Amino acid sequence: MVELESQEAVTVASTADIAVDVSLRLLAAATSLAAAVVVAANHQQRWGIRVDFTLFQVWIGFVAVNLVCTVYAAATAAAAARKAMGRWWLHHADAVVVNLEAAATAGAGAIGSIAMWGNEASGWYAVCRLYRRYCNAGAAALALSLAAVLLLGVACARSRYPKMPPTT
Protein backbone atom coordinates (compact mmCIF):
# COMPACT_ATOMS: atom_id res chain seq x y z
CA MET A 1 0.00 0.00 0.00
CA VAL A 2 1.36 3.41 -0.97
CA GLU A 3 1.11 6.19 1.58
CA LEU A 4 0.48 9.63 0.22
CA GLU A 5 2.27 12.64 1.64
CA SER A 6 -1.02 14.05 2.89
CA GLN A 7 -1.56 10.88 4.92
CA GLU A 8 1.61 11.25 6.98
CA ALA A 9 1.22 11.74 10.68
CA VAL A 10 1.93 15.33 11.66
CA THR A 11 4.49 15.73 14.40
CA VAL A 12 3.49 18.53 16.72
CA ALA A 13 6.08 20.80 18.29
CA SER A 14 6.31 20.57 22.02
CA THR A 15 6.71 23.54 24.30
CA ALA A 16 10.36 22.54 24.70
CA ASP A 17 10.91 22.70 20.92
CA ILE A 18 9.43 26.17 20.79
CA ALA A 19 11.51 27.24 23.81
CA VAL A 20 14.68 25.99 22.10
CA ASP A 21 13.88 27.94 18.92
CA VAL A 22 13.11 31.11 20.87
CA SER A 23 16.27 30.70 22.98
CA LEU A 24 18.51 30.13 19.95
CA ARG A 25 17.16 33.19 18.20
CA LEU A 26 17.32 35.43 21.29
CA LEU A 27 20.90 34.33 22.00
CA ALA A 28 21.81 35.01 18.37
CA ALA A 29 20.21 38.46 18.62
CA ALA A 30 22.09 39.21 21.85
CA THR A 31 25.48 38.10 20.54
CA SER A 32 25.00 39.89 17.24
CA LEU A 33 23.99 43.10 19.02
CA ALA A 34 26.95 42.78 21.38
CA ALA A 35 29.32 42.38 18.41
CA ALA A 36 27.91 45.50 16.75
CA VAL A 37 28.14 47.55 19.97
CA VAL A 38 31.70 46.40 20.70
CA VAL A 39 32.86 47.46 17.24
CA ALA A 40 30.92 50.73 17.21
CA ALA A 41 32.24 51.74 20.64
CA ASN A 42 35.79 50.60 19.88
CA HIS A 43 38.40 53.30 19.37
CA GLN A 44 41.93 54.01 20.46
CA GLN A 45 44.20 57.00 20.07
CA ARG A 46 47.95 56.82 19.99
CA TRP A 47 50.43 59.49 18.99
CA GLY A 48 47.61 61.71 17.82
CA ILE A 49 46.18 59.10 15.46
CA ARG A 50 42.70 57.86 16.33
CA VAL A 51 41.50 54.53 14.99
CA ASP A 52 37.86 53.49 15.01
CA PHE A 53 35.53 51.33 12.97
CA THR A 54 34.79 54.03 10.39
CA LEU A 55 38.30 53.75 8.95
CA PHE A 56 37.40 50.54 7.10
CA GLN A 57 34.24 49.96 5.08
CA VAL A 58 34.24 46.30 6.11
CA TRP A 59 33.76 47.28 9.78
CA ILE A 60 30.89 49.61 8.84
CA GLY A 61 29.30 46.72 6.95
CA PHE A 62 30.00 44.42 9.89
CA VAL A 63 28.10 46.72 12.25
CA ALA A 64 25.21 47.13 9.78
CA VAL A 65 24.86 43.40 9.11
CA ASN A 66 25.02 42.58 12.81
CA LEU A 67 22.26 45.09 13.52
CA VAL A 68 20.12 43.61 10.72
CA CYS A 69 20.73 40.12 12.12
CA THR A 70 19.78 41.34 15.60
CA VAL A 71 16.45 42.68 14.35
CA TYR A 72 15.78 39.54 12.29
CA ALA A 73 16.62 37.13 15.11
CA ALA A 74 14.49 39.06 17.60
CA ALA A 75 11.56 39.24 15.17
CA THR A 76 11.69 35.53 14.38
CA ALA A 77 12.01 34.75 18.10
CA ALA A 78 8.77 36.66 18.61
CA ALA A 79 7.22 34.68 15.75
CA ALA A 80 8.38 31.44 17.35
CA ALA A 81 6.92 32.49 20.68
CA ARG A 82 3.60 33.14 18.91
CA LYS A 83 3.87 29.66 17.39
CA ALA A 84 4.07 31.03 13.87
CA MET A 85 7.08 28.91 12.99
CA GLY A 86 7.06 26.36 10.20
CA ARG A 87 6.20 28.86 7.51
CA TRP A 88 7.55 28.19 4.02
CA TRP A 89 9.66 31.38 3.93
CA LEU A 90 11.39 30.92 7.28
CA HIS A 91 14.14 28.53 6.23
CA HIS A 92 15.01 30.62 3.18
CA ALA A 93 15.15 33.83 5.20
CA ASP A 94 17.22 32.06 7.87
CA ALA A 95 19.69 30.87 5.24
CA VAL A 96 20.07 34.38 3.79
CA VAL A 97 20.66 35.91 7.22
CA VAL A 98 23.15 33.20 8.25
CA ASN A 99 25.11 33.77 5.03
CA LEU A 100 25.08 37.55 5.48
CA GLU A 101 26.35 37.20 9.03
CA ALA A 102 29.03 34.71 7.94
CA ALA A 103 30.17 36.99 5.10
CA ALA A 104 30.41 40.02 7.37
CA THR A 105 32.35 38.02 9.95
CA ALA A 106 34.72 36.61 7.32
CA GLY A 107 35.36 40.01 5.76
CA ALA A 108 36.04 41.65 9.10
CA GLY A 109 38.19 38.68 10.10
CA ALA A 110 40.30 39.08 6.95
CA ILE A 111 40.97 42.73 7.73
CA GLY A 112 41.65 41.82 11.35
CA SER A 113 44.16 39.21 10.21
CA ILE A 114 46.04 41.76 8.14
CA ALA A 115 45.97 44.20 11.05
CA MET A 116 47.35 41.50 13.34
CA TRP A 117 50.09 40.04 11.13
CA GLY A 118 50.42 42.45 8.23
CA ASN A 119 51.22 41.56 4.64
CA GLU A 120 54.77 42.39 3.61
CA ALA A 121 54.17 41.62 -0.07
CA SER A 122 51.57 44.38 -0.34
CA GLY A 123 53.28 46.75 2.08
CA TRP A 124 50.64 46.52 4.80
CA TYR A 125 52.19 46.59 8.22
CA ALA A 126 50.86 44.95 11.36
CA VAL A 127 49.23 47.64 13.47
CA CYS A 128 48.01 45.56 16.39
CA ARG A 129 51.32 46.02 18.18
CA LEU A 130 50.56 49.73 18.34
CA TYR A 131 46.79 49.54 18.85
CA ARG A 132 46.52 46.43 21.04
CA ARG A 133 43.31 47.44 22.87
CA TYR A 134 41.57 48.24 19.58
CA CYS A 135 42.57 44.89 18.08
CA ASN A 136 41.56 42.93 21.18
CA ALA A 137 38.09 44.49 21.08
CA GLY A 138 37.87 43.65 17.36
CA ALA A 139 38.80 40.04 18.09
CA ALA A 140 36.12 39.87 20.79
CA ALA A 141 33.55 41.25 18.33
CA LEU A 142 34.57 38.62 15.77
CA ALA A 143 34.14 35.87 18.38
CA LEU A 144 30.68 37.21 19.28
CA SER A 145 29.72 37.39 15.62
CA LEU A 146 30.94 33.84 15.03
CA ALA A 147 28.77 32.71 17.96
CA ALA A 148 25.82 34.47 16.31
CA VAL A 149 26.57 32.66 13.03
CA LEU A 150 26.59 29.31 14.82
CA LEU A 151 23.40 30.03 16.78
CA LEU A 152 21.59 31.25 13.67
CA GLY A 153 22.93 28.24 11.76
CA VAL A 154 21.43 25.85 14.28
CA ALA A 155 18.14 27.78 14.15
CA CYS A 156 18.27 27.59 10.34
CA ALA A 157 18.83 23.83 10.46
CA ARG A 158 15.91 23.45 12.85
CA SER A 159 13.68 25.54 10.59
CA ARG A 160 14.40 23.25 7.62
CA TYR A 161 12.31 20.42 9.04
CA PRO A 162 10.07 22.09 11.58
CA LYS A 163 7.62 20.37 13.81
CA MET A 164 4.27 22.04 13.45
CA PRO A 165 3.25 24.13 16.46
CA PRO A 166 0.31 22.76 18.39
CA THR A 167 -3.02 24.24 17.44
CA THR A 168 -4.96 25.84 20.23
Swiss-Prot record:
Record key words, sorted: Cell membrane, Membrane, Transmembrane, Transmembrane helix
Parts of the chain on the Extracellular side: 39-54, 117-136
Membrane topology: Multi-pass membrane protein
Subcellular location, record wording: Cell membrane
Superkingdom of origin organism: Eukaryota
Pfam families: CASP_dom
Stretches assigned to the Cytoplasmic side: 1-17, 76-95, 158-168
The keyword Transmembrane belongs to this UniProt entry's keyword annotation: yes
TM region(s), chain numbering: 18-38, 55-75, 96-116, 137-157
InterPro entries reported in the protein's UniProt record: CASP/CASPL, CASP_dom
Recorded GO CC terms: plasma membrane
NCBIfam families to which the protein is assigned, alphabetical: A_tha_TIGR01569 (TIGR01569)
Record's subunit section: Homodimer and heterodimers.
Family: Belongs to the Casparian strip membrane proteins (CASP) family.
Name of the protein in its database record: CASP-like protein UU-1
